[in-house]
């Protein structure tokens, strides 16, 4: 059987941390920013962790 291919889109969006958790960037931070408050925009540029219920699925996609 051939090797499994990783999901290239997922590989660009997710990174696995040293402890094995999956890190992601927040959405809604790239355009249409005028109406969003400074505080909201600042918080959108902080990375966050993938929810525990989705972690197994994401790891399978990126073959980590």
UniProtKB/Swiss-Prot annotation:
GO CC list: cytosolic large ribosomal subunit
HAMAP family for the chain: Ribosomal_bL35 (MF_00514)
Pfam families membership: Ribosomal_L35p
Protein name stated in the entry: Large ribosomal subunit protein bL35
Keywords: Ribonucleoprotein, Ribosomal protein
SUPFAM superfamilies membership: L35p-like (SSF143034)
Family indicated by similarity: Belongs to the bacterial ribosomal protein bL35 family.
GO molecular function, one term: structural constituent of ribosome
Keyword Magnesium: no
GO biological process: translation
